UniProtKB/Swiss-Prot annotation:
Domain of life: Bacteria
The record's free-text note on cofactor binding: Binds 1 [4Fe-4S] cluster per subunit.
Presence of keyword Magnesium: no
Primary role: Catalyzes the isomerization between 2-isopropylmalate and 3-isopropylmalate, via the formation of 2-isopropylmaleate.
Alphabetical list of CDD domains matching this protein: IPMI
Enzyme class: lyase
Family: Belongs to the aconitase/IPM isomerase family. LeuC type 1 subfamily.
UniProt keyword annotations, A-Z: 4Fe-4S, Amino-acid biosynthesis, Branched-chain amino acid biosynthesis, Iron, Iron-sulfur, Leucine biosynthesis, Lyase, Metal-binding
Name this polypeptide is given: 3-isopropylmalate dehydratase large subunit
Subunit field text: Heterodimer of LeuC and LeuD.
């Protein structure tokens, strides 16, 4: 019987197996940020250990930093975490993309764009959405702080091998429907626990048609379905994306041959298989307090089925049977490790070009990295957004989470391109609706959700 992509990735990295069936995996890349690393570095210090492979470790500032005045950090804990990361990286000789550095940005944006993320690698980070890197045919997953310390000290991690789930995406996406809508559809249909104990492998016609940035969006939210990771077999698009980037392999052609072996064999069998025809998908909007509480834009909000629905409706200030078009939007956030890359900003700009943000709506665009920001400005996207009434910010996690100055006031609704809509995720009492960049941009213009398939906007942008 053939092997799944998961099998090939796993077997290449097993160092040892213990009596409990756990495998010791070698870790090829360890990404670090300011929030989950301080205790891990302190653990090394207390035990007089060093970082085993600083050359396979890379740190950045992202979660806590302000995106308006990046040097004016007024929160005491945030400042302490940022200062501590600087000190730790200096002491342990770990490369750091600090505030103002041209390589700085959200950890799951800079990894791929710098060429750190590569097919065949095992990648870990003290962050839930490390699965993003699986879009390159890497086995990437989030870890806790004690595991961060273990990887820093040993460059290995004890893990139990997950099962393999194959998610086949058949057909061609309609105009106005994106990778974000696919994952929100999957979550709304199968729930937030469908992937528990699995690694999700996405494949099929729709995957082949996607660019790398859409694939990253898809894998980014595999964790929201309970999966250990999301992966996609690398192809020519993957290889072309990695080629020539700063940290890409110098012996690219020989490495590429090894990358080409990373696919699921035709006679391999998944532990669970899901087939989705994307041909008739619509834009999605979440209405509740987890990512599975979502509906098509042309559907009414569902009836209450249990206490969780009751609580979600109450928290969100919405009602069963309500039209999605009637959901008010006071804030719009285009950013996060899910949707802050150049193509995301291009799509959003194509929606708002020549138009104005609705009076009373606060709209932010937060590029995922300094390089994304510079590329967008080179194309004139910042002018399109600013002329429409958006705020153009510096890179960071921003309004994805209530951990920095960018927050949604209590009781107000935000159309967000991020990945989580939990209670208080964007600030105390904030009401978060997860959508694609196009849907978020359109909501900024109208002050409520609209069906972008029925709205007139440019499919391509003129940068003159």
């Amino acid at each position: 019987m053939g092997k799944r992509l998961l099998d090939k990735l796993w077997e290449r990295h097993v160092v040892a197996t213990n009596e409990n069936g756990l495998d010791l995996l070698y870790i090829d890349l360890h990404l670090v940020h300011e929030v989950t690393s301080p205790q891990a570095f302190e653990g090394l210090r207390l035990t007089n250990r060093t970082v085993r492979r600083p050359d396979l470790t890379f740190a950045t500032m992202d979660h806590n930093i302000p995106t308006k005045d990046v040097w004016n950090i007024t929160d005491r804990i945030a400042k302490q975490q940022l200062d501590t990361l600087r000190q730790n990286c200096k002491q342990f000789q770990v490369p750091l993309a600090d505030i103002g550095d041209e390589e700085q940005g959200i950890v799951h944006v800079i990894g791929p764009e710098l060429g750190l993320t590569q097919p065949g690698k095992t990648i870990v980070c003290g962050d839930s959405h490390t699965a993003t890197h699986g879009a390159f045919g890497a086995l990437a997953f989030g870890i806790g702080t004690s595991e961060v310390e273990h990887v820093l000290a040993t460059q290995t991690l004890w893990q139990r091998k997950p099962k393999a789930m194959g998610i086949e995406l058949k057909g061609k996406l309609p105009q106005g429907v994106y990778a974000k809508d696919i994952i929100l559809h999957l979550l709304s249909k199968y729930g937030v626990a469908v992937g528990t104990g699995y690694v999700m492998e996405f494949y099929g016609e729709a995957i082949h048609a996607m660019d790398m940035e859409e694939r990253m969006t898809l894998c980014n939210m595999a964790i929201e379905g309970g999966a250990k990771a999301g992966i996609i077999a690398p192809d020519e698009k993957t290889f072309a994306y990695v080629k020539g980037r700063k940290y890409a392999p110098k012996d690219y052609e020989s490495i590429k041959k090894k990358w080409s072996e990373l696919y699921t064999d035709l006679d391999a069998v998944y532990d669970l298989h899901i087939l989705v025809d994307v041909t008739d998908l619509a834009p999605y909007v979440t209405w509740g307090t987890n990512p599975s509480m979502g509906v098509r834009i042309d559907e009414k909000l569902p009836e209450k089925h249990d206490a969780n629905d009751e609580r979600a409706f109450s928290y969100m200030g919405l009602s069963p049977g309500q039209s999605t078009y009637d959901i008010p939007v006071q804030h719009v956030f285009i950013g996060s490790c899910t949707n802050s890359r150049l193509s995301d900003l291009e799509i959003a700009a194509s929606v708002v070009k020549g138009k104005k943000v609705k009076e009373g709506v606060r709209a932010l665009v937060v590029p995922g990295s300094q390089r994304v920001r510079e590329a967008a400005m080179h194309k004139g996207l910042h002018r399109i957004f600013e002329e429409a009434g958006f705020e153009w910010r510096e890179p960071g996690c921003s309004m994805c989470l209530g951990m920095n100055p960018d927050q949604v006031p209590e009781g107000e609704h935000c159309a967000s391109t991020s990945n989580r809509n939990f209670e208080g995720r964007q600030g105390k009492g904030a009401r978060t609706h997860l959508v694609s960049p196009a849907m978020a941009a359109a909501a900024a213009l109208y002050g409520h959700f609209v069906d972008i398939r029925k709205e007139s906007y440019d499919g391509a942008i003129s940068y003159s």
